[in-house]
Amino acid sequence: MALDRAGRICVLAAAWALTASAAQAQTFELKLSHFIPPNHTFHKWALAWTEELTKESGGRLKFQIYPNGQLVGPPNRQLDAARNGITDIAFVLHGVTPGRYPTAELVNLAFSWPKAGSGSSITSKRMSELAPTYLAKEHEGLHLLFTAAAMPILIYSSVPIRKLDDFKGVKIRYSGVQNRNLLDALGAVPLLIQPPEAQDAIAKGIIQGATFPHEASLSLDLATVAKHATEPGLSTAPFAFAMNPAKYNSLPADLKAMIDKSTGPAAAEKFGKLWEAEEKRARDELIKQGVQIHTLSDADVAEIKRRAAPQIEAAIAAVDKAGKPGRKFFEEYTK
C-alpha cells in the first residue's frame, strides 16, 4: 500500500513537471492596439518594449502591434476592446470617451500638474504611482500596466491666436470634458473630433484648431493645414496603457513577472522622458515646416487661470459627489 502511495506521488510529480515544462516551452503571442501613427513616440516606445520582452523571454512572449486603429477601429473603442479580449493590450487617451474616466480626467484640468513640473516624465510617473489607489476602480475590467500624461497641450490652428480675445468663436477640437469646459470659458467653440481626424477636419474647415502637444501635431501632420501654434500649454492629457486581465492571468508566473517589471511607474517615467525629448525635436521641426509660434502674455495666462479656477473646483466636487476620490487624487497628484 505504501508503494502504491509512493507510486501515485511519483506519477503526480512527473505530471506536474511535464505541465511546468510545457508552460515553459509554450509561446504566447499578444496583440497590442493603439490609435496613433507609427511615427508617434508611443509606437516607437512600444516597439522597443515588445522587442525587449521577446528577447528576455527567449522568444516565449511575442507581440503583434496594430497602430492607427487597424485592429479595433476608432480611439474610443480601444479600452473596451482590451476589456472584451479583441486586443490583449491597448493604449489610448481617456479624453476620447469624455466623462467615462472622471477621476483620471482631473489630470486634464488647466495648469494642474505636480509642483515638480509639467514634463511627461514627472506627470506620468506620478499618475502611475497613484493609479492602484485612486484609478483602478474606474478602470474595472482592465489590468493597468501604467498611466501617462502627455506634454502640455497647445492650440494648433489655421488662424493665429496671439491673445485671449482671439479664442472667441474659433472652433477647436478638444479631448476630454475638462478641455471642453476650458475652451468654453475662453469663448472658443469646442468640438469633439477623434485625433486621427483632426487634420482632415481642419482642412475641410469643420474646425480651425486642435489641442495637441507639438509631438502629436507632427505625427498627425497638422502643419500642412495649421500654420499657427499658441503657447504655453494650458493643460495635459491622461492616457492608459492596459491589458486584458484574463490574458494577463493566463501567462506563466515568470512571464507575468517580466511584464510587471517592465511596466508601472518606472516605465511611465522612462516613456515620459522619451516624450519630452520628442516634444523638443517636434517643435523645432514644425517651425522648419513653417509653423509660427505665438506666446500668450503673462496677463492673458493669469486671466485664463482665473477663469479656470471655479471649473477646477467644480470638477473635483463632481467627482467626489459621484462617490469617487476626486479631491484626494487631485491633491496627491498636484502636490
Question: What is each stretch, according to the model?
Answer:
Residues 26-120, 133-335:
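N-terminal secretory/targeting leader peptides
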